[in-house]
Amino acid sequence: MAVEFSTRLDLLDQWGMLLKLKFKKHLSFLGLVGLCCAQLAFANPVPNPKANPADPDKVLKIAFPSTETGFDPVRVNDLYSNTITAAILQPLVTYDWMAMPTRIVPHAAEAMPEVSADGRTYTFKVKKGLFFTPHEAFKGQRRELIAQDFVYTLLRHADPKNRSPQVSDFDDKIFGFADARKKAVASGKFDYDQRHPGIYVIDRYTLAIQLNQPDRNFLSLLTNPFAGGMAREVVEKYGFEELMANPVGSGPYILEKWVRGSKIILKANPEYPGFVWDFEPPANNPVELRIASQMQGRKMPQVGRVEVSIIEEPQSMWLAFSGKEIDVVAVPPSFIEKALTPKNDLQQTWVAQGVNMYRSVEPDIRYQFFNMKDPVIGGYTPEKIALRRAIIMGFDVDEEIRVIRKGQAVKAQQMVSPVIAGHDPNYKSLVKFSPLSANALLDEFGYKKDAKGYRSMPDGKPLVFTIYSSTSSIDRERDELWKKSMDRIGIRLKVKKDKFPEMLKQGKQCAIPSWALGWTRSSEAEFVMKLLYSKTIGQNNYACFENAEYDANFEKLKRLPDGPERTKVLHNLYRLMEVNGVLGLSSTGIATRLSHQRVEGYRKHPLILGDWIYYDIQKP
């Protein structure tokens, strides 16, 4: 899941980013739904009186450090949009709130799926009595969540018009998925009414998903909001563009208001049945034990309203928390000294106010990508590879961590975060910071300096390296660090500013030369390494990297169990990334999150988004 690099820095991410367990969620569709699954036909349907215990007077105020793009779960791929859709839709499975290592558990499913002996067919039973938010598309009837809704959602990913960022995952994993998509491309229309061989309904509450081969990571895909059950009649009512602003699900919250790039307000879904807080904390963890003791036995959710502000500047974010305008904050790096002592303990001024701290190494990776299709830095010829490698060697990551991250990060040696399954603590990158070596490499490949000390291309044309970044103060700091680094090796730097959603769009079109991003919420190495898989160009492969050897190793990685052979394949992938100069790795964040005293049970799970159902807040 793509996250703006400056955002990862501003708030050390408003939610977690990647981790050593599992990651993702998918599912949904088939057949004409119409109103066939509605129950009582009242002009104004009466929600279940025993449903959602949330108190409308309990208002949680939070902030995102970057703008959202929209709320169609099949089409969005940024952290903040997904955080909202995760609170609106229900996938079949999710993660246990406190289990470490992480454990997948049923959500909208009645139980964990039945898996065939050959490991290729997953059969799910949907819980009875789950209902969508009341909506005019249901024509006055209560609309129950059924198996067909999950089939429909999955098939929406196969529909080419939706341009799903997850399509490569499903192509690889689900039987017949790629063929259905290719058929739709050829015909110009996806047939949602034809029975799909790999995703199909067995009865009203039962669906089956057939895989191409046994897959260790398939269930983790289904934990994501993009696999939550969607009602076909809602999708068809709104159409392609309007659906982004009108998500309808069976999850705990409803989108009440959206002012693009400014404000998002959610209110409790009256149809959501709720649950009792009953989770087992990790042993010997005082913070988690305290939270469990505080929350055990409460009827959840309790938060009846969530108000999200978009605050892109770190200073404004910090002032909002200090002034109790927001209830929780991931401390921006530039304000870490105002929150923590030199030993990383909470400052006494905050302790005296009853503020709680939750601190963790994040499941994320931050990197600078280099577009292989860019006319200046792209390409696979020796001189272009030398240029990218020199740029990477010329950038001082240690200084970035010290100056911009304020020491709250771990230098990345590989693409997989230390807290993600597949990380190898013994692996060390070949790439080292060395302006001397970078200059020598550029000299060797014909990038000559002019009288002012700036280099030209080997053909004599001016060399100008262009990076994209946001308008935030943190990105301005980073721009200065890039300028300093490039001046050391004689490369002119041009910085282009734009908004995060627009840069995501351009990145998918291979139109950005270079940009700093973060990748988050991957549960396993496979989901990180696909960032350079050629089949994800136009989705998550912003470097637009195509390499047959990389692809072959990635295909092998997906099939291998844990062990020395799989580790060797991961090493091959890392080396191919380094040798070709595709990514300049930066760091994994150490996040410090603070919550005011009135917030009870606050913590962060590495993989769960839209997690407001798990904690409580005192009324004003």
What feature does the model see in each segment?
Residues 110-170, 208, 317-320, 381-383, ...:
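Aromatic- and charge-enriched surface segment that lines or borders ligand/interaction sites
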Residues 44-45, 52, 79-80, 213-216, ...:
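Detector for C-terminal structural segments
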Residues 45-47, 63-117, 155, 248, ...:
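N-terminal lobe/hinge region of extracytoplasmic solute-binding protein
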Residues 248, 308-316, 334, 495-505:
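Short helix-initiation/N-cap motifs at beta->coil->alpha
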Residues 66-83, 105-108, 136-139, 165, ...:
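A structural "hinge/loop" feature
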Residues 167, 256-267, 294-296, 307-374, ...:
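Extracellular/periplasmic solute-recognition and catalytic clefts
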Residues 97-99, 178-206, 210-307, 315-316, ...:
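Gly/Pro-rich hinge or "lid" segments in bacterial periplasmic/extracellular proteins
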Residues 57-66, 120-125, 150-153, 207-209, ...:
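Short, well-ordered beta-strand elements
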